Amino acid sequence: MIEFKQVTKTFHSGNQTVTALDNVNLHVARGEIYGVIGFSGAGKSTLIRSANLLERPTSGEVLINGVNLATLKSRELQKAKRNIGMIFQHFNLLQSKTVFDNVATPLKLTRTPKADIRKRVTELLSFVGLSDKADNYPEQLSGGQKQRIGIARALATNPEVLLCDEATSALDPDTTSSILHLLKKINIEYNITILMITHEMSVIREICDKVAVMEKGRIIEEGSVLSIFSNPQHPTTEKFVRSIIPTGLPARVKEALQQKEPNRRIYEVTVTGDSSHSDLLRSLIQTFGIEVDILHATMNDIQGTSFGRIYFDLRAEPEILAEASNYLKSHPLQPKEVTGDARVAA
């Protein structure tokens, strides 16, 4: 649906060349809500603005429905852009226009008949819950209401793609939650593909199906939201995950490590969905006659799927511990031995 192929974007400032996007490859499937997260200056805004050619790539291709927008002539490009809606961090509403006229603007630009405009705008204002604000002006609205109007305007031309540029970063937590709920509703009821950028991992957790992490113009990690949260690989990704889910060693585990008992090993296992840690622990007891103690367990929820980390220790003679370690190395749950602040493969 949306595809970036080896996209690079450079800017020139005096004698300096700044690379905002560096050989980016990204694929967003039809119907997905795909989040891109990164710190300030990571290249997120340039990426999303490249999706509808607000920024033209220096090299590479951006494809929407298999079409490279950069190859289209002016009239064809205008038509293609009607299929791409966009909402902004600071709403970008016309202050001198009423709510009705703001939502109607894209339709007026395409010379849609007045009766059709009224029908569509009325429908959209009802959808975003602001039917009673049609004659109001933006200055009379709250931040959340302004963003709802921005969303209605972005949907006016019945797009298949919605681009969200930090759509909730100017909003308070409760309003953010309501806007995210509305975006999820749009995705489900209108089957609109959503590409959103944010610096808030809580937004990714709330509604995204997949996520890409950007740093210095590159995608450094990507995958399903569940896989990224449960097993971040890059240090930057781990920072984002840690901002809402602690990943450090629990106090009891640290205390156990400090005791440095020779016949004791400590492991961490990540469990997701239906994965059964109880079978793992039971097999250790039954197969090796080994003493197993759960030191700490945490559970979290990602869009209805639970995942967590369990820390357990094994006590036995060195030969038995060695056999158990070999067993754990081949186990599907891939437990990791905890040594100090490090986790190493079992």
Curated annotation (Swiss-Prot):
CDD domains attached to this UniProt entry: ABC_MetN_methionine_transporter
Primary enzyme class: translocase
Keywords, alphabetical: Amino-acid transport, ATP-binding, Cell membrane, Membrane, Nucleotide-binding, Translocase, Transport
Domain ABC transporter: 2-241
One GO MF term: ATP hydrolysis activity
Stretches that traverse the bilayer: none
Listed PROSITE patterns: ABC_TRANSPORTER_1, ABC_TRANSPORTER_2, METN
Catalyses which reaction(s): L-methionine(out) + ATP + H2O = L-methionine(in) + ADP + phosphate + H(+); D-methionine(out) + ATP + H2O = D-methionine(in) + ADP + phosphate + H(+)
Subunit and interaction comment: The complex is composed of two ATP-binding proteins (MetN), two transmembrane proteins (MetI) and a solute-binding protein (MetQ).
Protein name per UniProt: Methionine import ATP-binding protein MetN 1
